[in-house]
Amino acid sequence: MSVATSDMAEAIPERGRAVLIAGPTASGKSALALALAEACGGVIINTDSMQVYGDLRVLTARPTPADEARVPHRLYGTVDAAVNFSAGAWVEAAAAALADARGRGLLPIFVGGSGLYFKALTRGLSAVPAIAPQVREDVRARLEQGGVEALHAALARRDPTSAARLNPNDRSRVARALEVVEATGRSLTDWHRDALPPLLPPEQVTALFLAPQRDELYARIDARFELMLQAGALDEVAALAARKLDPLLPAMKAHGVPALIRHLKGEISRDEAASIGCADTRHYAKRQFTWFRHQLPEFEWVAPDRAAERLERQTG
């Protein structure tokens, strides 16, 4: 344990604060959270939209069973890949995990890379109700039959504001916006105006964004993807593909899954699949930098090797 981490053990619990550790994929978030949880008597609460799925432990870099045995972990691998797990569902689960942590006197440490989840924690989330399965199935069928252009045209007729805001080629977001307006009679924009209150107001949290040097991060991403393949990621994807799930489900679009499925079908080589998976992950990391910079400026950016020291300074 570093001196700074040792100091955090004294500083943070006295204040009863929650700690938020965000950052791009492969930036060292989990290691920092584990050290902090061990030092402070904390519980690590997953704040990553892909690590909720039980089918993809290796490919989503979930904590190992050994790490999970060291400190309490919550919301990891609890959702089946067949479920379209929404941000609203995550907030509900996170609220229960937060209440449990506080009831047991544990420091809540939210860790992950999903910006929308962190925004919901500190800013609140729109109160869009659950969409009836029949509506969702109807929209998906129209998407498959007519394509995204026809679906976007339908959205433009029902909800021109959302249609103008969305990329017309973004199948998932266009379908989601049309589902909402057809199921509720209100546009997604209207629902976003009626946000639910935040679970953790900004003044109650210590929030860091781990920001490695880009070239170092991209090298880590490439190396880690190869290690994932060696650790059984391809077997995970084969088992997932055998279930023949809707390709639009979030788990089916996890970084690396589509390319590895193409490899399993004999369409591309293993090396080509790995190259695509690495490139997709690097692009995602770049988007994470941009998203947090513009959407959550209250997060303090820090180099990973200075994060423990910075946490101590913020809370001490």
From Swiss-Prot:
Does the entry feature the keyword Calcium, yes or no?
no
Task: Tell me the residue numbers annotated for binding ATP.
Answer: G23, P24, T25, A26, S27, G28, K29, S30
- Residues noted as binding substrate in the record, renumbered to the chain: T25, A26, S27, G28, K29, S30
Q: Which GO terms describe its molecular function?
A: ATP binding; tRNA dimethylallyltransferase activity
Which cofactors, if any, are listed as required? Mg(2+)
Q: Name one GO biological process term.
A: tRNA modification
Swiss-Prot/TrEMBL site (Interaction with substrate tRNA) positions: S114, R136
Which reactions does this protein catalyse? adenosine(37) in tRNA + dimethylallyl diphosphate = N(6)-dimethylallyladenosine(37) in tRNA + diphosphate
First-level EC class:
transferase
Q: Do the record's keywords include ATP-binding?
A: yes
Q: Might you give the EC number(s) for this enzyme? A: 2.5.1.75
Disulphide connectivity of cysteines: none
Extract the ranges annotated as region (Interaction with substrate tRNA). Answer: 48-51
Identify the Pfam families for this entry.
IPPT
Which keywords does UniProt give here? ATP-binding, Magnesium, Nucleotide-binding, Transferase, tRNA processing
* Function according to Swiss-Prot or TrEMBL: Catalyzes the transfer of a dimethylallyl group onto the adenine at position 37 in tRNAs that read codons beginning with uridine, leading to the formation of N6-(dimethylallyl)adenosine (i(6)A).
Query: What protein family does this chain belong to?
Result: Belongs to the IPP transferase family.
Q: Which PANTHER family match?
A: TRNA DIMETHYLALLYLTRANSFERASE (PTHR11088:SF60)
Q: How does it assemble?
A: Monomer.
From the Swiss-Prot or TrEMBL record, give the protein name. tRNA dimethylallyltransferase
